[in-house]
Design a protein with these regions (language model features):
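Predominantly the C-terminal beta-signal and adjacent terminal strand-loop region
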Residues: 130-179
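Extended hydrophobic secondary-structure segments that form protein cores and membrane-embedded regions
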Residues: 14-15, 92-96, 141-142
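Outer-membrane beta-barrel domain signature
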Residues: 4, 20-27, 62-68, 109-117, ...
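Gram-negative (and chloroplast) outer-membrane scaffold detector with strong preference
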Residues: 41-136
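Short glycine/proline- and aromatic-enriched beta-strand/turn motifs that initiate or cap beta-hairpins
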Residues: 2-44, 48-56, 149, 170-179
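Membrane-embedded beta-strands of outer-membrane beta-barrel proteins
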Residues: 34, 77-79, 124-126, 142, ...
Length: 179
């Protein structure tokens, strides 16, 4: 896709982007994001930030009455190389993500202190585009990430609540605007 000025470069905006992630949290994590990037011929580089719906998780300890409320945000940087057929494009991608999770304990005898963790993840995926117009595309992506850290969510003096998963699978759906 070339910009209207006839150059092989173009700026793109991804908004809104809906995400559903499996595995990092105990239940699917639903999020919304916004991104921007550039295209050069068949190459794309874009960054997207997401915020996810909070989840409450109970401790894995038998008979326990405590847990944590988890909130997550993620920043992702993708590089993709696409192949276009008429109005459709498919592009394999590699990705680098930075995960941010906060946890606040709850339950009997728990002081509700807030703690956070930040760690990187690496991944790969596939994104497909359907160009409804030259300046607007609907895209869908499926990607997998290996988390380079596995934070533990624990309540001091009470025990482990949960350890976050080593990998994540993410499905996204959004609009790409090409000014």
């Amino acid at each position: 896709m070339q910009s209207t000025a006839g150059t092989p470069w173009s700026f793109v905006l991804h908004a809104p982007v809906l995400a559903a992630d499996l595995e990092l949290f105990p239940r699917p994590a639903l999020g919304i994001g916004l991104g921007a990037g550039i295209r050069y011929r068949a190459w794309q580089i874009f960054a997207t930030g997401y915020v996810y719906r909070a989840q409450s998780v109970a401790s894995l300890e038998p008979g326990s009455a405590f847990g944590a409320r988890l909130r997550r945000a993620s920043g992702q940087l993708f590089t993709c190389h696409g192949r276009r057929w008429s109005q459709f494009e498919a592009a394999p991608c590699i990705a680098l993500a930075l995960e941010y999770v906060t946890a606040r304990g709850f339950g009997e005898g728990v002081a509700p202190r807030l703690r956070h963790a930040v760690w990187p993840a690496v991944g790969a995926g596939l994104v497909t585009h359907w160009y409804a117009l030259e300046s607007l595309a609907l895209f869908a992506a499926l990607s997998g990430y290996v988390e380079l850290a596995r934070p533990r969510v624990a309540i001091q003096d009470l025990g482990l609540v949960r350890r976050l998963a080593p990998a994540t699978v993410s499905a996204t759906l959004g609009l790409e605007w090409i000014p």
